[in-house]
Amino acid sequence: MINYIKSTEKDMDMLIESRMEMLKVVNNLPDNYKFNDDFIEASKIFFESSNQTTILAINEEKKIIGCASMCYIEIMPTFSHPTGKRAHLMNVYTNARFRRQGIAKKMLEILINEAKERSVTEISLDTTETGRAFYKSCGFKESEECMVLDLR
């Protein structure tokens, strides 16, 4: 049986471990890749203090097998988004051994329901090509209204 929980500070070590695993997979990094301590610390600070929710999927062995995060932001209200409340979905990941079991979909459903409770009018996300079909199957659509300026 898989349990789905909202992460708290007590889950921080498992949460960071899961995030680093996901980043290695998505970025094709070797298993022994060592993340910069500043990067890990910044991730911890984000999870501790940010306006976000992270759902963890935990198996019977008490191991995180999936995670998904929703970051909440407020913008100036517009006609199409009268509450000004938006969200950005990130870090959706299921361990390869547990894929195709509905875990990502369940985590996404939990986060979408919370977003609705918070009066969010739009959820955006960045996706890999591999994930695109999954998000489309969950009702997400390509957007032509977004542009990005990279400030790095």
What role is predicted for each listed range?
Residues N3-E17:
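A short beta-loop-alpha structural element at the N-terminal edge
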Residues K6, V120, K136-C146:
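Conserved acetyl-CoA-binding loop of GNAT-fold acetyltransferases
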Residues L23-S43:
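Conserved GNAT-fold acetyl-CoA-binding loop/helix
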Residues K44-L56, H88:
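A short helix-loop-beta-strand connector motif used in the catalytic cores of GNAT acetyltransferases and
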Residues L56, K63-Y72, H88, Y93:
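Conserved beta-strand in the GNAT
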Residues F98-I110:
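Conserved acetyl-CoA pyrophosphate-binding loop and the N-cap/start of the following alpha-helix
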Residues L108, A115-T127:
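Conserved GNAT acetyl-CoA-binding A-motif
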Residues I123-A133, V148-R152:
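Conserved beta-strand-loop-alpha-helix junction that forms the acyl-donor binding cleft
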